[in-house]
Amino acid sequence: MSTAPIEFPPPVDSAKEFVGPPTDPEDERIEVGVAIVGGGPGGLACAIRLSQLLAEDEAVLDSLGEVPIALVEKGKGPGSHLLSGAMMNPSAMKKLFPDMSEDEWPTYGTVPRDTVYLFPNRKRAIPLKPTPPPFRNHGNHVTSVAQLGRWLSGHAEEAGVYILGETAATKLQIGRASCRERV
């Protein structure tokens, strides 16, 4: 019988450590309508799409206050902690930017074909036919996630998203029957 670390989690009181009333002075707070934590592609896409939806409904936009959408990023700016390359399915970008040409996206182009080889030794390469599903990327775009993050952050700022770089979200603030985030 084996023992796993998950069976012995450290004692954490979630209610005290992660949720609480506001503690900072009023003059050090920024009231925002919606706070999005994380400046990766998902958080940035969320901020951009939300700003698109709010642009269609002025009443809701006005009800969210002076800063309707804020994105909290622990790095210097969005993309600063994103290191890898990726295969990107273009469907989300097409939905997010329907009027934009794929040539304008920050990618290195599309994958023209898929081929996977096994190399049993230095002299031999055996193609796997058909290509296993996890390795099928035909039609996907090759991109740098850091470059994509920086590009999306530019579009988010153009859409009116307030980006708080070098800011860590540490606690969810609960006050006056609404959620607040402590940064």
Predicted regions and their residues:
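A short, basic/flexible loop-to-alpha-helix module at the beginning of a structural domain
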Residues: 14-31, 56
